Amino acid sequence: MMNQMGMMMQQQGVGVPGGPGGVGGVGMPGPGGVGVAPGMMQSPQMQQAQQQQVQQQQVQQQQVQQQQVQQQQQQVQQQQQQQQQHSQSAQQQAQQTEKVDNISKVKVLVGPLRDALSTTIKTAAQLIQQNTLADAGSKTVDLNNAPRFDKHLEEFYSICDQIELNLKTTKLCMQQCTSSQQYLPIPVATSQPPLPETNALTYNQYLEVVKLQIGYAKDIHDTLICAAQNISPSE
């Protein structure tokens, strides 16, 4: 009977009464000690192993988060680079398609011309004031630190020359366009299939026009030579 009760108590994790250090499952010393089931107690080594596993999982999660953050940063940088490249290409295309005719160049040079004129006038005023004070004897003039009037004046004239050249070129282009419209106002037909324009010249007609223009130029040349010979006749 006692043996059966002891077996039941061992299964339930209860120490067997009587006798010092009775053990039930894992018995506690002393009479009537309460036992603990084998699966309920964990050794310190197992606890350390679990803690290490938890720490490793946390470290892995942190690494994964850092990798995700780095990937996001890289994506943002790539997007910024792509945007910069698109903006640069758009600027280059805009610069290429921008008008580079002489009138546009003149408009661009108006601003620097205004600044150069203002700087030149200010420099001249400063020099006049310094010379006046020096003549009055109230101040000594330091020639090394004096403003360079000649430099600013040269810059002003340089911009004026650029504007003048662009305007002259524009005038010549307009004259050429006017002459072209005057002497050959009708477009020339090529050897391709006939174009829908009804007022286009054929190639034979174009040759006749060219011959007439050559003859006209030759007549002018001969007239000029005769006039030169009449003005200064040879002995």
Curated annotation (Swiss-Prot):
GO terms for biological process: regulation of transcription by RNA polymerase II. Keywords: Activator, Nucleus, Transcription, Transcription regulation. Component of the Mediator complex. GO terms for cellular component: mediator complex. Belongs to the Mediator complex subunit 29 family. It is found in: Nucleus. Residues 15-36 have a biased composition (Gly residues). Transmembrane segments: none annotated. It comes from the Eukaryota. Residues 1-54 are annotated as: Disordered. InterPro entries: Mediator_Med29_met. This is Mediator of RNA polymerase II transcription subunit 29. It holds the Pfam family Med29. Component of the Mediator complex, a coactivator involved in the regulated transcription of nearly all RNA polymerase II-dependent genes. Mediator functions as a bridge to convey information from gene-specific regulatory proteins to the basal RNA polymerase II transcription machinery. Mediator is recruited to promoters by direct interactions with regulatory proteins and serves as a scaffold for the assembly of a functional preinitiation complex with RNA polymerase II and the general transcription factors. GO terms for molecular function: transcription coregulator activity. Its main location: nucleus. Residues 1-14, 37-54 have a biased composition (Low complexity).
